[in-house]
């Protein structure tokens, strides 16, 4: 980009009113203050100096020839913006409303750029050495609803194209020169202008953008829109390659050269972790200082009553269990709007793990009905089996043993396919990464050798062609009454585990064991510990099944079950606390 050649252009920027212009590689004028790219080209005043050229349009000028080796000058934030654009498009293709990309994610990203002092502020961090001041009045709530698109439906430009700013900012803005310090360094160490600086930047109180943060932005946007996609669904869609994440950089335009330090910023070779993305979601929401999110009400997909029904259907459990899960939700207060709604500006900002909580409620109901102590559930199964044999025309009683056998087989098959798919996953991108242009030929040669070896190996083992991408679905297990090979338990009765007492129904099981006897102290990093050997095989299977569905650690689900029990049996825990305090007093 040449600032000297752009000095002749004296018009004010339509976005920030500054008169500070540079030239892109295509010959377009761009504002060095807000990076707004105009449609005006540099005028060619003397064509005699340029051989073999023709004037095709008046006042259009001649596009500058792209240097294919150097490519565009671009910043790291623009790379993340392009990835967010691709992820938003993928979510749109999955059925999410266009408002998520056009309004919600647009405003979240713009607010992040200002809060992190990368754009929409005085002296962005990558244009001057002075510490910039964020203009807080630029992002009023009325401004959020009226601003034009940042991530355009038509294209994703290399620079931020829009964003209305306050009048005070227009009068106080000054032109900033593009930093020359990193130009020679970036040509060797990174493809982006600020790749080296960005990888070394550590500023207290600033949330640094990473690849996992892109998923946090997506989930925040989904949560704001109250879309029918949970965090576990989002991560599963990433795993199934419906949403760009692994090797997302290979979708960059050819002119955006990526090498050197950019490898560590955009290259990632690990699957996103549920707990990590959850924490980053809360972190980003707090950093952006977002207002209270729209209420999660009973008719919202993320409400536990609806999610419980969804997961009961998925794991082939009786529909009658839904009334029991709703009762637990009511008793624990987990269906209250204030409990479910995310409020980043609250004193203790935290959002609910909606999917994990719903599954934990189902586990608690299973313990209430069947105890899950490797004994009582099997005795109830014997009663159900005998009843079903004698009354084949009546509505069948739910048989826990038969359900366990069918689900165990389906679960093992599904998990084996999942493990095989993960083992076969090719982490290397089609677009090789390299540290410098010196390494470029070697990187491409190695990639070519790997592709050839894979083809030869496939021929030797006579492996069938890899199946195409699976169509996205909210369900991983499907159960229907028409399926003759597998029993569908949705319509089965819980009469074998319930007994009538007056006008109410009680469980035949009068016992209950707590998943956690004592919670860890507040300064500990976890709620409780989980060791499989300490629990029954039935309980282990239930946790493993649901953990696989949500792609989470078993210990995380065990913690959530313990928290549900703590709310449900609050009196029992309070009695234990009093006893422990009295013992301490006696010791003194």
Swiss-Prot record:
The modification N-acetylmethionine is found at residue 1. The modification N6-acetyllysine is found at residue 440. It comes from the Eukaryota. Residues 74-261 are annotated as: N-terminal cyclin fold. Residues 69-73 are annotated as: B-linker. Keywords: Acetylation, DNA-binding, Metal-binding, Nucleus, Transcription, Transcription regulation, Zinc, Zinc-finger. A zinc finger (RRN7-type) spans 4-39. Residues 40-68 are annotated as: B-reader. Signal peptide: none annotated. The keyword DNA-binding applies. Although it shares weak sequence similarity with GTF2B/TFIIB, displays a similar subdomain organization as GTF2B/TFIIB, with a N-terminal zinc finger, a connecting region (composed of B-reader and B-linker regions), followed by 2 cyclin folds. The RRN7-type zinc finger plays an essential postrecruitment role in Pol I transcription at a step preceding synthesis of the first 40 nucleotides. Belongs to the RRN7/TAF1B family. Component of RNA polymerase I core factor complex that acts as a GTF2B/TFIIB-like factor and plays a key role in multiple steps during transcription initiation such as pre-initiation complex (PIC) assembly and postpolymerase recruitment events in polymerase I (Pol I) transcription. Binds rDNA promoters and plays a role in Pol I recruitment as a component of the SL1/TIF-IB complex and, possibly, directly through its interaction with RRN3. This is TATA box-binding protein-associated factor RNA polymerase I subunit B. The lineage of its organism: Eukaryota, Metazoa, Chordata, Craniata, Vertebrata.
